[in-house]
Amino acid sequence: MKRFTVCCFSNKIHKNGDRNPDKKSRESMEVSRKDNEEPEKQNNNNVASIIGSDRTNVIVNHDFSSGMHSWHPNCCEAFVVTAESNVSHGVLDPSKCGSYVVVKNRKETWQGLEQDITNRVKPCSLYKVSATVAVSGPVHGLVEVMATLKLESQQSQTNYQFIAKTCVFKEKWVRLEGMFSLPSLPEKVVFYLEGPSPGIDLLIQSVTIHRESEPELERVTAEDETIVVNPNFEDGLNNWSGRSCKIVLHDSMADGKIVPESGKVFASATERTQNWNGIQQEITGKVQRKRVYEATAVVRIYGNNVTTATVQATLWVQNPNQRDQYIGISTVQATDKEWIHLKGKFLLNGSASRVVIYIEGPPPGTDILLNSLTVKHAEKIPPSPPPSIENPAFGVNILTNSHLSDDTTNGWFSLGNCTLSVAEGSPRILPPMARDSLGAHERLSGRYILVTNRTQTWMGPAQMITDKLKLFLTYQISVWVKVGSGINSPQNVNVALGIDSQWVNGGQVEINDDRWHEIGGSFRIEKNPSKALVYVQGPSSGIDLMVAGLQIFPVDRLARIKHLKRQCDKIRKRDVILKFAGVDSSKFSGASVRVRQIRNSFPVGTCISRSNIDNEDFVDFFLKNFNWAVFANELKWYWTEPEQGKLNYQDADDMLNLCSSNNIETRGHCIFWEVQATVQQWIQNMNQTDLNNAVQNRLTDLLNRYKGKFKHYDVNNEMLHGSFYQDKLGKDIRVNMFKTAHQLDPSATLFVNDYHIEDGCDPKSCPEKYTEQILDLQEKGAPVGGIGIQGHIDSPVGPIVCSALDKLGILGLPIWFTELDVSSVNEHIRADDLEVMMWEAFGHPAVEGIMLWGFWELFMSRDNSHLVNAEGDVNEAGKRFLAVKKDWLSHANGHIDQNGAFPFRGYSGNYAVEVITTSSSKVLKTFGVDKEDSSQVITVDLQGL
């Protein structure tokens, strides 16, 4: 068939998204396909007043037929050139091209021509701007001309909203086009044209501003109607364009081997030179903020000998303040063999002046094929019911013959061609973590499985458990393990589960001696498997493996929480005595007292992002329910300096202003990040001297700018899992980072921060390794002041978490959960997981704070971990979070004793006390309870009662 092609001309912008730490310069469609063509002279009549019809021009005297009426030069001069004036400006003859205005004597780039349009625009409407412009004078090459809005209000500073820009050659008419929308109407809105360098004359032939769509609140669209125009290419390539590449329409490709999955045609994005090149459509004005949309695309790839590649749907959003945002909607692993469905959701927190959806991802040279793309308002998914678990049998081992009581391995089989036998001499006591869960329990048999003739690391004992597992029940794993002699390096031993084709980590330990070691882990299944087995693996081939007392049993979480509540009463509450003064004791003896805690001072914070604070509903939940905050990306080096020397602290400043103005304390996350994949390419390319200078500059810039504003800093994130800076600059660099940070901001507590500390899943970051690292830093002079446990945990079990806290608590440093999140498709189970973690943290004396790693759907790092649905509904996990926080408030009722006192026991924080005398007189006072162990006496003045 005949091929139709469309190309896109582009200008450069910057991409600020966490999925690309390099923040390389990206291109976007800022000039339409006809931007460089000479437009015809526009002769439509202007209607000067009203904003009624969508096609009414907002601009008065749009073609200067009434001279300079309604137009004003901005700190420069302007005049109109007409055919009758017998004056031309360069080669532009008004008798041929029509009248135009000349803006001259410009001494600044922002000087140009303006018009007040305040009374002719509406909030939330989308407007399209089209201006015919040229330049004259000392012009060399291309010159930029921009359209801008000036927004003035008495209550705030003047803001400027970029609309569009175009490149102009000398004395050649070019059309400048763009769109804008105002979320609210300021006191004054001024449209103006600006941009050429001082001394260059700006020429304007006509300006139109038409309303493209009605306000969002007035718009009524069917819920199942896609906002993408021509989604199946039935109208060819209309409304589609290439994102800095070519797009082509096909009915087939590859000699007929590739045909559409549906419809008659499909499009390809070809001649791609960057991963982000692809096919796009502008959907400005069609998406409403704070509403969830679902995008569905049918895609595949072709060419360049690439058979599989990641394809991604992305949203580019330009905010009214010209801040660019890239939202990754979804990814899929596409192939050249078949069409694949890509599906994902997105939400806009704030207002947008432009929105473009596009498909990107494969390596350069590989074509993206698109059969269809739809974007619809997402259906609300009904909440999942609480799972019904019959006879959970808490504490009962589901494995057969764990004790090897008949001296055989009946019930077990060897995974691989290894040999299983029974031997004597293993520990007879339960491993500590299992003992904490099971309490009093029969002793182990002392027999173990000896695994010999191992030729692969995965070889070991195994048992099928398919029919023994129950959905949504959390299981704890416990076992003693040991390795044979002859090892010359540390050996990892792992309890693993094969759930259909998925490998599940049931706990790991590193062994470097001939002693028995405990493995403790946990897991849960959320859909019925066709096959499930448990096995023990890990040492190198040729090394014997010994396994004793392996147990898998369901955990009674409610019993654990009851224990923790009693623990919290001991370690978090203190005795308080209210001493009432100010009047004769006889007047208030026996008066009733009602004490209510208003706020617990224990830090409970959350991660936030810059885009989140544009959403009023998000901010409202945040301010009501958290007293600390941490920034997801906006303080990280790859965000603040994506390109060398180009610093961006505006996002962090905006977020810090919100927090400080609402008495929210903040953690600084993070100064450096040791994992190489998170380090900007320009840093990775540096030699040792330049890198060392860059590190010092980063410390100086960040710590001086925010001195005294962040209570904590994660100095060098994830040092147990990465070593980029240490490898490049030597072992002392980590210590020097801590020392320099402390010198620059002595008020901040400096933390280490890492993951898989608390779950038994990673021998790299077990509590023992973390302790060793912290002690090593301190011995070399690093002022480590706090321990960060990230807390990205699956199926948490209290005693396993508590064991890690106990081991780290010996160091005497404050422990914080810095990035806590839990995940389950079932909101009730997610709520259980979160409740477990909150009580374990609150119930341990070494823990001094909890930070959630987000709470709002579509803005979490893990699926199925949110507490609030994207459109603002609090789900079951969120309700449980609020309920736990409510449990952390102390209340007391009683009467004033004969000594004028009222004793009670309560958590630290802010309180209100109401005193009611026998004559029904009332007085309400507030007071605070400090965090201490000893009793606190608080005097309450009742004068006037």
Swiss-Prot record:
What is this enzyme's catalytic activity, as reactions?
Endohydrolysis of (1->4)-beta-D-xylosidic linkages in xylans
Q: Where is this region: Disordered?
A: 16-50
PROSITE patterns named among the record's database cross-references: GH10_1, GH10_2
Pathway in which the depicted protein is active: Glycan degradation; xylan degradation
Tissue specificity field = Predominantly expressed in vascular bundles, but not in vessel cells. Mostly expressed in stems, at lower levels in roots, and weakly in inflorescences and seedlings.
Basic and acidic residues bias: start-end ranges: 16-41
Q: Where is the GH10 domain?
A: 589-884
Assigned EC number: 3.2.1.8
Biological function: Binds to and hydrolyzes insoluble and soluble xylan substrates. Exhibits xylanase activity.
UniProt-recorded name of the protein = Endo-1,4-beta-xylanase 1
Species whose genome carries this gene: Arabidopsis thaliana
Q: What is the lineage of its organism?
A: Eukaryota, Viridiplantae, Streptophyta, Embryophyta, Tracheophyta
Chain's gene name: XYN1
